[in-house]
Curated annotation (Swiss-Prot):
Gene3D superfamilies hit by this protein: Phosphorylase Kinase, domain 1 (3.30.200.20), Transferase(Phosphotransferase) domain 1 (1.10.510.10)
GO BP of this protein: cellular response to fibroblast growth factor stimulus; embryonic organ development; negative regulation of apoptotic process; positive regulation of ERK1 and ERK2 cascade; positive regulation of fibroblast growth factor receptor signaling pathway
Pfam families in alphabetical order: Pkinase
Binding site for ATP: 647-655, 670
InterPro entries in UniProt: Dual_SerThr-Tyr_Kinase, Kinase-like_dom_sf, Prot_kinase_dom, Protein_kinase_ATP_BS, Ser/Thr_kinase_AS
Family recorded in the similarity comment: Belongs to the protein kinase superfamily. Ser/Thr protein kinase family.
Protein name stated in the entry: Dual serine/threonine and tyrosine protein kinase
Record-level GO cellular component terms: anchoring junction; apical plasma membrane; basolateral plasma membrane; cytoplasm
Catalytic residues as annotated in Swiss-Prot or TrEMBL: 766
Biological function: May act as a positive regulator of ERK phosphorylation downstream of fibroblast growth factor-receptor activation. May induce both caspase-dependent apoptosis and caspase-independent cell death. May play a role in the embryonic development.
Organism: Xenopus laevis (African clawed frog)
Keyword ATP-binding listed: yes
Subcellular localization(s) per the UniProt record: Cytoplasm; Cell membrane; Apical cell membrane; Basolateral cell membrane
Length: 916
């Protein structure tokens, strides 16, 4: 028995010596992995600090906070609430803070203390933890152990993340190479719960511990594994190692691993610590171990994983199994993947914050730009339409007087019998008429006559007004609807209590036109005139004794009242009051509109200042942070691209070949070195536009970006943009010769691409031969979106290639029609079938000479081979007036028709074919 124990111990010592060098090698590999992690963590931390500073500046600027640098905007919170709402979401901010502050920690779990100790010794080198024999394992009661970095070797008992316990340890009594077992075990007679839960904290001047802590879980009899993870997992970056010292997992092991998977969802590095035959998971023909099958059933592994732990097809679990302890250095690969996963997740969250807020800025810039353009037009439109309405109503009042007179006479004639009948049957209010027909007093007679008059006037009023409204109702559709909507929009954006005065005056104008009945029911001239006529009736009737109130009497009174009404006087009075009221309302409307215009003038001035600030400061600054976070995400996921041979040079960068990157091949890599802060911000903003565009078959795909901080030996920083690589550009294609049908199809492809950009609100600004790439089937894609910008974000800068630049580009005020102009020039080359310069441009000695000639109207000449319809399309596209250029939605069907006529019929134009 003694010989067997000695032999076993000897084998264990030999195994430890064999793995000692592997452990030191693994420690160095781990160190390199943590250096890689720390390098990119530092960049993430810097980006997060800059992001928090950006949001803090935005909050101070637009919240109206005391001492804010821009207090002139403090009162604009309601108008610019969208900017005020641009904040760092609390949930994302807390997550990112925790991620960048968390220190990596390796948790060593396992079936028993022997396996856990062997892994710890393998990582740290030497025999820090004693390796127990099989008999000792059964009664082991080890406490939790935590290894930390320190300038000198120290051992102490401490409660996790709290305080150190005063306790005399055996290790304090002298030097040691292996931690005494008495300090590792929890005494069976220990009654103090703090001492039973305390962990053994070991500080060592070990290089690996500078980057990571190591926690060895206690024996199950001392504390559950879940408690160890629960104490740490929320504030560390967890790397979980599970030491397997038996041939297979026990039922208790499986339950423990199931709990870890369900509760913490952490990947696990499984490693065998016993001396077994080589069992690498990647053996293609070998028999899989029982342990491997158990881990698949538990969901930690999936079939299709290679021995390096890389995921196979459909694999989502990054856990890893190594069946040789000598391969412990593979923990470096595993830990790098785990830490990289944390960095990628954080970079994705941070970039989502950047992109979401940047889109809000761009959308707000669109709103402000539109407001600056549309508000003056709305004011002018409202003024013009109100004038037209006023003049139309005045003309109506002039010519309607005679019509009103005829209308009143016609109405009275048509209603006479009905009015008389209604008057005869009328029941008086508040007047008691005796049943026997006895006469009533003069006062009561007067009241009866009043009520008969009210009946006649109300019926006449209703009939006349209905006919008058129908005669002018067309004005409602012609003027009122659109004008009212314009006013509502103008008053909505003018946040003042008196903002609805203009609408009220407009309503008065409409009231004068459509509600004429007020002139009958108020103390107006018409009413007084009618009253005078009624008084005359009363005087004729009441100079004798009071009459008997009978139906015949009521009918006679109504008859006299109707006959004494003057239709011409009524019509004249109606028109006079209508004109007077209309003029008063028109003058009040003009005054209130002027006041509204003054209010908008001040508001638009602030809007313009804010628009400039968003376009020149806020959006570019945030875009740079977005570029950095997205590039960090790309380099972590796909690595730094390998630069191949040079393909070409442009004004702002060099294009290289790149065999493959991020699963894409072949690729092209454009290296851009921004010379200053402005170019950095412009590049970042343009990169955001490119990344935001949906994929389209007529645009070259942008795969990703990487920021190279070591470019030029570290003297400068370069942005590497990785795109798909195509066969050649259109310039080379025309030089080598292309058929007519191919060239026209290329033109259609370019139009489709430009049309898509314009539909996305983006202007390319540099359409030319070298920015149209061709695949092997001669289908075209637009590239070099470096000058692309939404119209609302354009500063008016002069960009592009001189030959293709529209005249208005030099003024700084332009829109997406500059792309239509550039296409017209491009189409000239396509139809000519060559790359020879037009004569008008070839004669120019310099760019300035060329620009001056273009401004004066110089355009390419018509070649004899040109089809008439093609030439007309070119001329329309390069029209000097941007508003006269056709939209791409019009160009596309025209071009398709040309292609069908020239290429798909028997009467194919040979002239154009001759140019190939």
């Amino acid at each position: 028995m003694q010989r067997d124990g000695t032999r076993s111990a000897r084998r264990m010592d030999e195994g430890d010596r064999r793995t000692g060098s592997a452990g030191r090698s693994g420690s160095r590999e781990l160190g390199r992995g943590f250096s890689y992690y720390n390098k990119y963590l530092a960049r993430l931390q810097q980006n997060l600090r800059d992001t928090k500073r950006f949001f803090r500046d935005i909050k101070l600027t637009y919240s109206g906070a005391p001492g804010g640098p821009d207090t002139e905007f403090s009162g604009a919170e309601g108008e610019f609430g969208q900017l005020h709402s641009i904040t760092f979401p609390r949930q994302e901010e807390e997550y990112l803070k925790l991620t960048v502050r968390c220190r990596p920690c390796i948790f060593i779990l396992g079936q028993n203390c022997s396996g856990r100790g062997r892994v710890a010794n393998g990582l740290l080198g030497g025999q820090l933890l004693p390796i127990l024999t099989h008999g000792d394992i059964e009664c082991c009661k080890r406490r939790r152990i935590r290894f930390r970095h320190g300038k000198q070797t120290l051992v102490s008992l401490a409660l996790p993340e709290q305080y150190e316990l005063v306790h005399q340890l055996v290790a304090h009594q002298g030097k040691w190479d292996t931690i005494p077992e008495e300090d590792l075990d929890v005494p069976e007679d220990e009654e103090d719960p703090a001492h039973r839960l305390a962990e053994l904290e070991v500080t060592l001047p070990h290089q690996l511990l500078q980057d990571v802590d190591i926690v060895v879980s206690p024996c199950r009899s001392s504390q559950a594994v879940s408690m160890t993870l629960e104490d740490y997992v929320d504030h560390v970056q967890s790397i979980v190692v599970y030491a397997v010292s038996e041939e297979m997992l026990s039922k208790q092991d499986e339950e423990e691993l199931t709990e870890i998977k369900e509760k913490y969802k952490l990947p696990v590095f499984f490693i065998r610590t016993s001396s077994t035959k080589d069992r690498l998971i990647g053996g293609s023909e070998g028999v899989r171990s029982v342990l491997y099958e158990q881990l698949i059933e538990l969901g930690y592994l999936q079939r299709g994983l290679c021995n390096c732990g890389a995921a196979g097809s459909g694999s989502t679990a990054p856990s890893m199994l190594v069946e040789q302890f000598e391969k412990i250095r593979q923990l470096s690969t595993f830990s790098r993947q785990v830490l990289q996963m944390h960095l990628v997740d954080a970079a994705i969250v941070l970039n989502m914050v950047h992109s979401r807020c940047l889109d809000l800025f761009i959308n707000k810039a669109f709103d402000m730009h539109r407001d600056l353009q549309i508000t003056p037009k709305r004011l002018e439109y409202t003024r013009q339409k109100e004038n037209e309405l006023y003049e139309s109503l005045m003309r109506i009042s002039d010519r309607k007087q005679e019509e009103l007179k005829d209308m009143i006479v016609e109405t009275l004639n048509s209603m006479r019998e009905q009015l008389l009948e209604d008057a005869a049957n009328m029941q008086f209010k508040d007047i008691v008429i005796p049943q026997n027909g006895e006469p009533v007093s003069a006062h009561e007679v007067k009241c009866c006559i009043f009520q008969i008059k009210e009946l006649i006037i109300s019926r006449l009023n209703q009939a006349v007004v209905n006919k008058l409204i129908s005669s002018v109702d067309y004005l409602r559709e012609s003027f009122v609807g659109t004008m009212e909507r314009c006013l509502r929009s103008l008053e909505k954006s003018q946040q003042e209590s008196s903002s609805h005065v203009t609408s009220n005056h407009l309503k008065q104008i409409l009231n004068a036109a459509y509600h004429v009945e007020v002139t009958f029911n108020s103390g107006s001239t018409v009413t007084r005139m009618v009253w005078e006529q009624i008084v005359q009736i009363i005087q004729r009737i009441t100079w004798v004794s009071p009459p008997t109130i009978t139906p015949e009497w009521k009918r006679r009174v109504a008859q006299d009242a109707i006959e004494t009404l003057s239709a011409s006087k009524l019509a004249k009075s109606i028109c006079s009051q209508f004109c007077k009221r209309l003029k008063s309302s028109h003058e009040a409307f003009a005054a209130s509109l002027k006041q509204l215009e003054v209010g908008h003038s001040g508001r638009l001035e602030k809007t313009n200042d804010l628009w400039l600030r968003v376009r020149k400061d806020h959006a570019p600054r945030l875009a740079r942070l977005s570029l950095e976070s997205r590039s960090l995400q790309d380099v972590l996921l796909h690595g730094k691209p390998r630069i191949g041979r040079e393909l070409g040079r442009g004004q702002y960068g060099v294009v290289y070949l790149c065999d493959s990157w991020g699963g894409h091949f072949p690729c092209a890599l454009k290296s851009v070195v921004p010379p200053d802060e402005k170019h950095w911000n412009d590049l970042a903003l343009e990169f955001h536009y490119m990344r935001s565009l949906p994929k389209h078959e007529r645009l070259v795909d942008l795969h990703g970006s990487v920021i190279d901080y070591s470019y030029g030996g570290g003297s400068s920083i370069a942005v590497l943009l990785i795109t798909e690589r195509l066969h050649r550009d259109l310039y080379v294609g025309l030089k080598t010769g292309l058929s007519l049908e191919t060239r026209l199809q290329i033109a259609l492809d370019v139009v489709e691409g430009i049309r898509f950009l314009h539909n996305q609100g983006v202007v390319h600004r540099d359409i030319k031969l070298k920015n149209v790439l061709l695949d092997k089937k001669h289908r075209a894609k637009i590239t070099d979106l470096g000058f692309c910008k939404p119209e609302a974000m354009m500063s008016g800068s002069i960009v592009g290639t001189p030959i293709h630049m529209a005249p208005e580009l030099f003024s700084g005020k332009y829109d997406n029609s500059v792309d239509v102009y550039a296409f017209g020039i491009l189409f000239w080359y396509i139809c000519s079938g060559s790359v020879k310069l037009p004569e008008a441009f070839e004669k120019c000695a310099s760019k300035d000479h060329l620009w001056n000639n273009v401004r004066k109207g110089a355009r390419p000449e018509r070649l004899t081979i040109f089809d008439e319809e093609c030439w007309k399309l070119m001329e329309a596209c390069w029209n000097g007036d941007p508003s006269q250029r056709p939209l791409m939605g019009i160009v596309q069907p025209m071009l398709q028709g040309i292609m069908d006529r020239l290429c798909h019929t028997q009467e194919t134009g040979k002239a154009l074919e001759d140019s190939t």
